[in-house]
């Protein structure tokens, strides 16, 4: 699948996404947002939902993914768009109008070879997947915002021939109600100050470990209110610190199943929608025909180059359909990001990308009748 579908990680568990909007306690809402974030990670980094690492297709400029996700009493909607090709930036917007929760974000992924020397958290030969960007979630009922990180990852397993992603470093989620979640990925080389890393299932596979703590922003001691620890790709526990009780054990494969994306039939999609645009390529990949895969990819890429050539010749300026660059100060990011000295890094993402909600709500196919795409 194309990288524009990775945004489905946010919405494939609609009831988990909606849960914070139903919770009266600001502290517990922050915990539920943290839980939602952790549950989204496997889909983001194990592309296709399997246990092996797969590289997604590189989106073309203007590529779209539009889908709904429903489980129980919750329905989440998702629109993602490739808003830049150089550098490659994917923007996403999700919403659940019934529960009054919505969010948008933009991300750039850069692959960098790393020898693994000189960093305890990133030890071992691998490729760094450096992510730039962030997301913001808003809960209408409480007029509350959450700043969501882009986790950093490494591709490991080159020596064994079994590649897998390993998240590294420390990430934060910051809420406007005064709580911070701090997430440390992978056992640090010297785990001073950390509790013993848990082992789930009795097996030897201890990849994808993490530990997260939730504390108050105004607490200089950062006293943990909750600790979540385990495997972000498997199972983890949530512990209430004051009582010492494990209040929940979360298992991705059992207790919190993801639901598939609901989309139009491929033949009814706009030519810019990813599953229609890439259909010949996907079919060739499934047949194992690498020669035809290369031919089909070349056809699509050549069509895109022709479109860019026409725009350059006519002086036409390409603009995204549903997102735009922010003009002026980014006050919400500055207010939340200052809690952890969070850098914006807008020079690495060709600016700050925000959704135009009115355009999303008024969307109507066909989106760009003059688009040059192969069928």
Regions found by a protein language model. Name each.
Residues 1-22, 27-375:
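Extended acidic, Ser/Thr- and Pro-enriched interaction/regulatory segments
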């Amino acid at each position: 699948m194309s990288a524009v579908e990775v945004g489905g990680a946010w919405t494939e568990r609609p009831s988990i996404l909606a849960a914070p909007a139903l919770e009266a306690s600001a502290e517990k809402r922050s915990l539920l947002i943290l839980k939602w974030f952790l549950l989204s990670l496997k889909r983001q980094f194990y592309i296709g939902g399997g246990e092996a690492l797969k590289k997604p297709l590189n989106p073309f400029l203007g590529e779209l993914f539009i889908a709904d996700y429903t489980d129980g009493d919750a329905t989440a909607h998702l629109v993602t768009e490739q808003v830049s090709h150089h550098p490659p930036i994917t923007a996403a917007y999700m919403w659940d109008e019934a529960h009054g929760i919505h969010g948008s974000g933009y991300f750039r992924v850069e692959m960098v070879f790393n020898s693994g020397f000189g960093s305890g958290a990133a030890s071992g030969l691998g490729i760094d997947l450096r992510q730039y960007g962030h997301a913001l979630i808003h809960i209408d009922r409480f007029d509350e915002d959450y700043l969501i990180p882009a986790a950093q990852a490494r591709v490991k397993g080159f020596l064994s021939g079994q590649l897998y992603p390993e998240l590294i470093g420390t990430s934060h989620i910051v809420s406007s109600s005064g709580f911070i979640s701090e997430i440390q990925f992978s056992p640090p080389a010297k785990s001073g100050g950390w509790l013993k890393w848990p082992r789930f299932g009795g097996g030897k596979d201890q990849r994808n470990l993490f530990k997260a703590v939730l504390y108050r922003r105004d607490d200089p001691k950062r006293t943990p209110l909750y600790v979540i620890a385990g495997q972000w790709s498997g199972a983890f526990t949530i512990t209430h610190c004051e009582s010492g009780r494990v209040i929940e054990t979360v298992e991705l494969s059992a207790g919190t199943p993801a639901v598939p994306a609901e989309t139009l039939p491929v033949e009814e999609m706009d030519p810019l929608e990813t599953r229609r645009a890439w259909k010949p390529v996907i079919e060739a990949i499934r047949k194992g025909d690498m020669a035809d895969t290369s031919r089909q990819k070349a056809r699509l890429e050549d069509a895109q180059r022709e479109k860019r050539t026409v725009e350059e010749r006519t002086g036409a300026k390409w603009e995204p359909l549903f997102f735009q660059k922010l003009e002026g100060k980014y006050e919400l990011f500055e207010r939340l990001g200052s809690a952890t000295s969070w850098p914006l890094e807008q020079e690495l993402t060709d600016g700050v990308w925000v959704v135009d909600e009115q355009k999303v709500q008024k969307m109507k196919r066909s989106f760009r009748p003059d688009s040059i795409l192969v069928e």
